Structure formats: structure tokens, C-alpha cells
Regions:
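ATP-binding/phosphotransfer module of carbohydrate and carboxylate kinases, centering on a glycine-rich
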Residues: 5-195
């Protein structure tokens, strides 16, 4: 299924996603929209402009983060068609999550359609922003029901609701890598001595 058509999100459809989902992308888009020179601007500066604590074009700053979220959302949607798992956003630009997540969630929740006009969600699963209380509660909601296993008298608990959670990492890259390496090492030790 093709869900990212040329021209849908960006005029740069022949470039890798990182050209629109990176520090340099935030700077480039801000410069294009504001008409200002960006040589001395870092994403933190553009974030401060979005916050209103630094002079500059606030609308351009907000749009630069929103576009990053939108393109990141499109890339994540493509990945979620083949990988079933949580979406955790980290790295330097995650500090601007409140400006990035709306575009990302909008893109991940968008509809696509057929030539006959039939609309459906671009993802099979419901997308929950775990940084928002209502979405977090909905993500954790138990909608399981008992179903009978065919050709047996057994019943099992089955959750028919497909959900995916989107969260922002608060660990930082170094700590996340260290914890992952530690968990992997423990797993390998368990395999060696229990297997």
C-alpha cells in the first residue's frame, strides 16, 4: 500500500526523510518562511522564538517544527506498516515536542482514500499520544473479551483493539543506550546460564 504520494507533504519528495526531519530542516524551513538569515540560528533559538522569549518570526518558528512533525509522522506511518511497536521520539529536537507532536499526530491519524472515494485511516491501529492524559488512558483501557478457540472448548482473553503509543523519551541518548546495553547483557547472561 502506498501512503506517501509525491506532493502530499513536501516539495522535496526525492530526498531522504532526514532532510525534513532534522536540526538542519528546522533551520532551513525557518529561514525559508521568515526570510531571515539562519547562519547563527540553532534549533534552540528557533524554539525560543516559538516560545516568544526571543525576537523573530514566531509563525515561521511554529511552522518549522510542525512541518518536521508532519514529515516524521509520514515516515513513521510507513515504518509502522512493517513493524509493530511503540514510537519513542528522542534526540535534540524532542525538546520541542509540544510543537512537533501536533503535526506528527495529525499525519499519523490522517485518512487516505480510494479512487471510488472510500476513506479509511492510514494506519490499522489507533494512534495514542502517551504524553496526553486522555490518550494515555485510552491506550491503557482494557477492551479484552473472551473468545472460544475454534474446535475446542477453551476460551482465551482476546483484545481486538489495535493501538500504538507515541511517547517522548526523557532519558537522553546516553542513558537510554546504557540501559539498553545493560538489559541486553542481562539477557545474554540468562541465556548462557539458564539455557
Amino acid at each position: 500500500m502506498i501512503i506517501f504520494q509525491p506532493g502530499d507533504l513536501s516539495e522535496y519528495t526525492d530526498l531522504i526523510a532526514e532532510e525534513s526531519v532534522s536540526i538542519r530542516a528546522v533551520r532551513r524551513v525557518y529561514g525559508e518562511l521568515s526570510g531571515e538569515t539562519i547562519e547563527n540560528l540553532m534549533p534552540k533559538d528557533i524554539y525560543d522564538i516559538a516560545e516568544g522569549t526571543r525576537t523573530g518570526n514566531r509563525e515561521a518558528a511554529l511552522k518549522s517544527f510542525d512541518e518536521l512533525g508532519e514529515i516524521a509522522g509520514a515516515a513513521i506511518v510507513s515504518a509502522l506498516h512493517i513493524v509493530d511497536g511503540m514510537v519513542v521520539i528522542g534526540g535534540g529536537v524532542s525538546g520541542a515536542a509540544k510543537y512537533i507532536l501536533p503535526g506528527m499526530m495529525r499525519e499519523m491519524r490522517r485518512s487516505i482514500s480510494t479512487f471510488s472515494g472510500r476513506d479509511f485511516d492510514c494506519l490499522q491501529m489507533e494512534v495514542c499520544n502517551l504524553m496526553e492524559a486522555d490518550d494515555h488512558k485510552r491506550f491503557l483501557e482494557n477492551t479484552s473479551t473472551w473468545v472460544q478457540v475454534p474446535f475446542t472448548k477453551r476460551e482465551i482473553l482476546y483484545n481486538h483493539t489495535k493501538r500504538i503509543g507515541v511517547a517522548i523519551s526523557t532519558l537522553g541518548a546516553s542513558k537510554a543506550i546504557a540501559l539498553g546495553a545493560y538489559a541486553f547483557a542481562l539477557q545474554q547472561i540468562d541465556r548462557k546460564y539458564k539455557g
